[in-house]
């Protein structure tokens, strides 16, 4: 049976310079994640995607902000699809 499966991911980035903040807002738009909170030098991203998509997002931000990053992942949740796969 087809299912819909998602995982929640929060990423906090801190001690960001103005240019870095702008880059993070742009990359968040590209990844399709939400900026849920921010101030002058920190922000929190929220992603509700598949586990592998969240892996890719984490990999990107770790590459650029590892020492200034916190990440929290929730477990995956799933529900059976209501549409039939043979359509």
Where are these regions (language model features)?
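Long, contiguous binding/interaction regions
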Residues: 1-87
């Amino acid at each position: 049976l087809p299912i819909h499966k998602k995982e929640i991911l929060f990423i906090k980035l801190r001690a960001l310079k103005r240019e870095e903040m702008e880059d993070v807002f742009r990359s968040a738009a590209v990844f399709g994640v939400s900026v849920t909170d921010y101030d002058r030098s920190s922000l929190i991203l929220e992603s509700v995607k598949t586990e592998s998509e969240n892996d890719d997002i984490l990999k990107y931000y770790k590459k650029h902000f590892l020492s200034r990053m916190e990440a929290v992942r929730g477990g995956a949740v799933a529900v059976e699809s209501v549409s039939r796969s043979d359509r």
